[in-house]
UniProtKB/Swiss-Prot annotation:
Cofactors named for this entry: NADP(+)
Molecular function (Gene Ontology), one example: oxidoreductase activity
Top class in the EC scheme: oxidoreductase
Annotated localization: Membrane
Primary localization: membrane
Family membership noted in the UniProt record: Belongs to the short-chain dehydrogenases/reductases (SDR) family.
Membrane-topology descriptor: Single-pass membrane protein
Keyword Transferase part of the UniProt annotation: no
Residues annotated as transmembrane: 25-45
Species name: Penicillium fellutanum
One Pfam family matching this protein: SDR
The entry's keywords: Alkaloid metabolism, Membrane, NADP, Oxidoreductase, Transmembrane, Transmembrane helix
Name recorded for this polypeptide: Short-chain dehydrogenase/reductase phqE
């Protein structure tokens, strides 16, 4: 009788992982999880000091990791004039003399959207530079820096806002839906490379705290009441969805929801 194959736990060991938006929150947790699996990680962020601090935190958490396996690249994804060239620079640095295996994009404009009656053309378009234009520029250039095969992946980020919008978040909900639709198109255009989306629910990050301000405690209580598990999400838990999509070579065009059952209540 042929023995069953032994499950592998080292699938990401030595893989090159690029995390765009990796200085805090879910993105930082993805960086840490990837390093924990033995990956070589490149972090992209817009704030030089945050990048420096994030690298220091990761090196402290993984002291046995080769310092050269954690690389930081500054890139302002909100600037439409430079976003394409900045993204190509990040791809070049992440690839080094090899190829990138996985790209994760968690970057987003985390400022609270204005009320519907105060919307302007600029306030509607601005979040789209990071949420739509930047991923498309990544997709445009990644074939030069990745092997187009099922072992390679691009994972985008939407959110539960797509299916259950909160009042005042129409613009962001629209972009979340657009990201999911775009991912399916990219899964076709970039095949056999895999393209997927993670759609988080209420995840408590520093950026969320900053946005909510004094309303934070009430928002947490409301989110917990909406969840079937009775709690909000942590970046560390949600990061596992991104790791799964790197490992499952049969997942493409998929949306992985990690929202504590909030869509059921």
């Amino acid at each position: 009788m042929t023995p069953a194959p032994t499950p592998r736990t080292d699938q990401l060991h030595g893989s090159r992982v690029l995390v765009i938006g990796g200085t805090s929150g879910i993105g930082f947790a993805v960086c840490a999880a990837a390093l924990g699996h033995g990956a070589i990680v490149t972090i992209v962020g817009s704030n030089a000091q945050k990048l420096k601090d994030s690298v220091a935190r990761l090196k402290s958490s993984f002291p046995s990791t080769d310092p050269d396996d954690i690389v930081a690249v500054r890139c302002d994804l909100s600037n439409s004039d430079t976003v394409e060239q900045d993204i190509e620079k990040a791809l070049q640095l992440a690839a080094g003399n090899s190829k990138i295996n996985h790209i994760v994009i968690t970057a987003a404009d985390m400022t609270a959207p204005p009320p519907l009656e105060d919307l302007t053309v600029d306030s509607v378009q601005r979040p789209g530079i990071i949420r739509l234009v930047a991923p498309l520029m990544v997709a445009k250039h990644l074939p030069k820096y990745m092997n187009k095969c099922p072992q390679s992946s691009l994972t985008l980020t939407s959110g539960a806002h797509c299916l259950r919008p909160d009042p005042g978040w129409t613009v962001i909900s629209g972009y979340c839906g657009a990201v999911e639709a775009m991912s399916r198109g990219l899964a076709i255009d970039l095949k056999p490379l895999r393209v997927n989306v993670v759609a988080p629910g209420a995840v408590l990050t520093e950026a969320v705290k900053d946005i909510l301000g004094d309303a934070y405690d009430a928002a947490v209580e409301m989110a917990e009441a909406k969840s079937t598990v009775g709690q909000t999400g942590s970046p560390e838990s949600v990061a596992q969805a991104y790791i799964y999509l790197m490992k499952d070579h049969y997942a493409s065009g998929s949306v992985v929801s990690t929202n504590g059952g909030m869509l059921l209540v």
